[in-house]
A protein has these predicted regions:
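S-adenosylmethionine
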Residues: 1-279
Length: 279
């Protein structure tokens, strides 16, 4: 996280870009073995034959084309070719363009081709020694279930600002934006489909909803705060829990949020502005 935050501090991207970067980084790392296997097969080159910057660009491209539904294929290819031109040379850009377009063609001709790679150990994105241990301890069936569990996309959740619309109206509005959700708890919705569209909704941009995991908010629920309470959060950045507290104490309450890391405080300030909180 500290490396990502250093990049955020240097370039100061908006919330949409920051969130998108974090999703890509986390997912590519989680499925790194699988993505690298597919790159090797499609490009016809071993990892040592491709420079590290070009590997990173291909990983992003393969992730967006094969796994993510947030960006059209043509936009992925175009943006990554332009990125390659800006950091390398025309030869490298031509290589990236050729490999990504080959992947798109291969996928369009037979979307199921990738399933034939599932028998490779790299597909599981786990070190071989861990796979051997799991097979020994869990058996074949237990091993398969464990791998599927580790590699499945983690659920995404939306926190609702309790001072805004009723939950039924929020679910309806999200559905109209192509986002399928269901009630998870009093303050949270589980996203079943269309998570990539959440950051572009009007409700997100004006602070009516936020992306937050219920696990990270559990400590807030344990406090059992009431309307009008005054709460001091001394390890607050980037502010998701503080904003949750703010919605619970209401305009008659107050949250004093602080953190020792200046760059994280700045991130929190931007999110406070998005929510329009004055308390």
């Amino acid at each position: 996280d500290s490396l990502i935050e250093k990049v955020y501090t240097k370039y100061n991207p908006d919330y949409l870009v920051r969130s998108r970067c974090r999703v890509i980084v986390n997912d590519v790392i989680r499925l790194l073995g699988r993505i690298d296997l597919i790159i090797k097969i499609v490009s016809g080159k071993n990892q040592k034959q491709i420079s590290e910057p070009m590997q990173s660009i291909l990983r992003i491209g393969f992730y967006e084309i094969l796994i993510d539904d947030n960006t059209p294929n043509y936009a992925t290819v175009d943006s990554l070719v332009n990125l390659t031109k800006s950091i390398s040379n025309r030869k490298s850009a031509g290589f990236i363009n050729a490999v990504l377009r080959k992947l798109v063609r291969k996928n369009n001709n037979n979307p199921d081709w990738i399933n034939s790679l599932s028998n490779h150990s790299e597909w599981n994105s786990m070190p071989d020694w861990i796979q051997r241990r799991w097979k020994k301890n869990l058996g074949s069936e237990g091993f398969i279930k464990m791998i599927e569990s580790v590699n499945e996309n983690p659920h995404s959740f939306i926190r609702i600002d309790k001072n805004g619309k009723k939950v039924e109206q929020i679910i309806k509005d999200l559905s109209n934006d192509g986002i399928d959700t269901k009630i998870f708890s009093e303050s949270f919705l589980m996203v079943k489909g269309g998570v990539g569209k959440v950051l572009q909704t009007k409700m997100f941009k004006n602070g009516e909803i936020s992306i937050q995991n219920p696990a990270s908010a559990a400590v807030v629920d344990c406090l059992n705060v009431k309307r009008g309470d005054f709460v001091i959060d001394v390890c607050a950045a980037p502010g998701t829990k503080s904003l949750y507290l703010s919605s619970l104490v209401g305009d008659s309450g107050m949250i004093l949020a602080s953190d020792v890391r200046t760059e994280r405080v700045e991130m929190g300030k931007r999110d406070v502005y998005r929510h329009g909180k004055l308390n």
